[in-house]
């Protein structure tokens, strides 16, 4: 079963960041994704006056060493869950400012590169207007 839950302690967040090979951001909020109780990924993000900023949607290294698996769905659900939280907080724009963006994943989540090449999404109605195309 897929679970996406907020990370409650900074020590846990730092440890997962180390496992994912990403920079730990102590001022960021974070979600962790697990499949069948196995940790698969982390998303670090922050709420700012400009919008929500996602810094990482990263896979924990070495969790699929002896088996074939894909983390795309777990990372997708975690990314969408993060955007939903940002939207529920009254912040209706989000940006991805990570080091190495996965274009396919970010586009599936709903981000699009803006004129400056920064992945961005307008969350106005994104989770409530199911009949409209969002870009």
Residue ranges and their predicted role:
Residues 32-46, 95-135:
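Terminal substrate-recognition subdomain of acyl/acetyltransferases
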Residues 28-30, 58, 67-69, 119-123:
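Glycine-rich loops and low-complexity Gly/Arg-rich segments
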Residues 1-25, 130-135:
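Short amphipathic alpha-helix that is part of the acyltransferase structural core
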Residues 19-61:
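A conserved beta-strand-loop-helix scaffold within acyl/acetyltransferase catalytic domains
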Residues 52-115:
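Acyl-donor binding region in acyl/amide transferases
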